[in-house]
């Protein structure tokens, strides 16, 4: 069979191309997993395996990176790591080169927020050219919020002060909790189906990242994007930026600011300026996000060409050989220890003292057995004697007397069996159960 020379790979070439393919396609990723096989050799690098219930992947975190970790990793610990997929060419294994590590849960929401923001930005949901202008003459405002929260009270207060003619329709919904995001989507869809308002104000008061998390939902982002009614997002405080703020047609820093944005007053120019500033801020944020993505892509390409990676690979190979040598030495030492224990056991089994101990145990056993046999024999004899005594007692005259019978004896002690055994004038003794009676024969019949 002929093989074209151009199609024949060497192992090194194959591993090199696999490395370029994996590193070029996947880039930087986040991974949530459990640590196992953690090792920290003298080089300062860390080697570990990250796993879940079904799979595992080898990982390396070099000294320059792990010095920034604020805790000591341990086997069984759940962590969140960021890194790049790479191929360790000498062994043909693919691995994750870890750049940063956090305990699982710490920063996880922030990481999910950033990941979703990048995804939706790539899908075009934040694009400025998709934003709609607000109606020039707003008569009805639909407010999507909790009917009992502070946000709706602030909104109604601002509208009453600035323009009491504006009608407010509340689409009540929970703004916090497990099902809040779905409820908010349902309220927006309801408003779109009724077509009774000019603009929607999706809002709630301030809170922690967890409290505002319903407004970082991917489903809600698409619902806002697909809304046929212009949407203003006013979630939290000035410093809070949620996914809904990026997707909405306009963002207000607070619920009160949202109400001011949608109502007219004497200073209409200020309202327009606020709108323009909000759009400018969104455009600047989109520009920053785009440049951040470009910077990360450049950093990734630079890492692939960095000679430091080659040095790290050699250091990793050295560390692995050192670990294998330590394991081999421990295995050999364990084998010698077992052999020594086996020889000691065999020597102890051949010792005369051991045989003497065995014979002493045997003698003690036989003595105990003999004593037991003698005791059993004595018990059997006692039982036989008791049985014989019972039999004798059964035929004893005394036993007969106890049943109400009597025995009559002559003066010489002979048993009287017939009247002919007596004469008139003889003295007789009659034995009873509990005594005797003496009588004199006066007549023989």
Swiss-Prot record:
EC primary class: hydrolase
Transmembrane segments: none
Annotated family: Belongs to the XseA family.
Subunit structure as annotated in this protein's UniProt entry: Heterooligomer composed of large and small subunits.
Organism: Shewanella halifaxensis (strain HAW-EB4)
Origin superkingdom: Bacteria
Pfam families: Exonuc_VII_L, tRNA_anti_2
Protein name: Exodeoxyribonuclease 7 large subunit
């Amino acid at each position: 069979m002929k093989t074209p020379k151009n199609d024949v790979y060497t192992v090194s070439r194959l591993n090199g191309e696999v490395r370029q393919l994996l590193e070029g396609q996947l880039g930087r990723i986040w991974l949530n997993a459990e640590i196992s096989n953690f090792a920290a050799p003298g080089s300062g690098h860390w080697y570990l395996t990250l796993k879940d219930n079904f799979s595992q992947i080898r990982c390396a975190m070099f000294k320059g990176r792990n010095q920034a970790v604020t805790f000591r990793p341990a086997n069984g610990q759940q962590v969140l790591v960021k890194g790049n997929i790479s191929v360790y060419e000498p062994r043909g294994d693919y691995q994750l080169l870890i750049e940063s590590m956090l305990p699982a849960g710490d920063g996880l929401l922030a990481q999910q927020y950033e990941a979703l923001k990048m995804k939706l930005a790539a899908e075009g949901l934040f694009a400025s050219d998709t934003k709609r202008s607000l109606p020039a003459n707003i008569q009805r405002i639909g407010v999507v919020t909790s009917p009992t929260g502070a946000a709706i009270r602030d909104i109604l207060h601002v509208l009453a002060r600035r323009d009491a003619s504006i009608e407010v329709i509340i689409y009540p919904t929970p703004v916090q909790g497990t099902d809040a995001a779905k409820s908010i989507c349902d309220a927006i869809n309801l408003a779109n189906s009724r077509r009774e308002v000019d603009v929607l104000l999706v809002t709630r008061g301030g809170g922690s990242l967890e409290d505002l998390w319903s407004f970082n939902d991917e489903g809600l982002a698409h619902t806002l994007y697909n809304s046929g009614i212009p949407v203003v997002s006013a979630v939290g405080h000035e410093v809070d930026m949620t996914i809904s703020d990026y997707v909405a047609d306009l963002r207000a820093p607070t619920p009160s600011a949202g109400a001011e944005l949608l109502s007219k007053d004497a200073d209409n120019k200020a309202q327009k300026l606020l709108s323009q500033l909000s759009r400018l801020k969104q455009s600047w944020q989109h520009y920053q996000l785009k440049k951040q993505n470009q910077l990360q892509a450049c950093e990734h390409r630079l890492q692939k060409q960095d000679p430091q990676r080659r040095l790290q690979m050699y250091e990793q190979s050295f560390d692995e050989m050192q670990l294998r040598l330590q394991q081999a030495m421990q295995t050999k030492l364990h084998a010698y220890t077992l052999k020594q224990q086996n020889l000691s056991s065999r020597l102890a089994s051949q010792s005369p003292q051991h045989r003497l101990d065995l014979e002493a145990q045997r003698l003690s056993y036989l003595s105990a057995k003999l004593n037991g046999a003698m005791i059993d024999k004595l018990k059997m004899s006692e039982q036989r004697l008791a049985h014989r005594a019972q039999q004798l007692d059964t035929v004893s005259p005394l036993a007969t007397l106890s049943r109400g019978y009597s025995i009559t004896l002559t003066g010489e002690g002979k048993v009287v069996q017939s009247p002919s055994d007596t004469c008139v004038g003889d003295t007789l003794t009659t034995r009873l159960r509990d005594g005797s009676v003496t009588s004199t024969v006066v007549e023989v019949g």
